[in-house]
A protein has these predicted regions:
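...captures the hydrophobic TM-helix bundle architecture rather than a specific catalytic motif
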Residues: 1-218
Length: 218
């Protein structure tokens, strides 16, 4: 059965739905641990299944050409038009298998490990959201979209590291991780600016095509 790469958005949408459901339960039904125990891991297993089917289709068809899934134009600003698009190729599919596969195992382990914690639903909401941003980071077809994923992963790292914020050491560790990531943000934004000035594009496929010519021209 051939599964089109156009369906890769489902791999992101499923854990996003898990975040919304578990987030709502954390706010209004924090004691609904049975529902959280099902929703949290199920959305990750579903995402893994979607990725695995697309990976299998790519492998059987011997596809090597990158496939761009356009969702919508995010920033139509003259020459700089940033599209919210997902880039599917062999490398991204391998990384998606890792993210959703390992993520599923972590979610399943957490069902037992975190069961007695009063913030159970909140924890799974954060964990689902962490995977969402990891997938955006891997799938982003341009530097701005990748940057969204990067920022989201940094935010979720802060939330998860400082999850038991009642302990000062955990709260401080979360703040430290958040601040250190801001150093990376600065370098990332400077690099994006320089690439835009030099090549006039932040799209990965366009940059890969333009960069060799730019370097050859000196």
């Amino acid at each position: 059965m051939y599964v089109s790469a156009d369906l890769i958005w489902l791999a992101v949408a499923l854990p996003l739905a898990g975040f919304l459901i578990n987030g709502a339960l954390a706010l209004w039904r924090p004691d609904a641990k049975s529902a959280v125990s099902v929703v949290g891991p199920a959305v990750l297993l579903g995402a893994f299944a979607v990725v695995a089917l697309i990976f299998r289709s790519y492998a059987l068809a011997g596809l090597a050409t990158p496939h761009v899934v356009h969702l919508w134009t995010w920033l139509p600003a003259g020459a700089l038009s940033v599209e919210l698009s997902l880039l599917v190729d062999r490398l991204s599919l391998v990384m998606l298998m890792v993210v959703t596969g390992v993520g599923s195992l972590i979610h399943l382990f957490s069902v037992g490990y975190m069961r007695s914690d009063p913030g159970y639903a909140r924890y799974f909401a954060y964990l689902n959201l962490f995977v969402v941003f990891m997938l955006v980071l891997v799938l982003g077809s341009s530097l701005p979209v990748l940057f969204i994923g990067w920022e989201g992963v940094g935010l979720c790292s802060y939330l998860l590291i400082g999850f038991w914020y009642g302990d000062k050491a955990n709260a401080d560790a979360g703040k430290k991780a958040f601040l250190v990531n801001r150093i990376g943000d600065f370098g990332f934004m400077v690099a994006m600016f320089l690439i835009w000035v030099a090549l006039g594009s932040l799209n990965f496929l366009e940059v890969a095509e333009l960069a060799p010519r730019h370097l050859a021209a000196g």
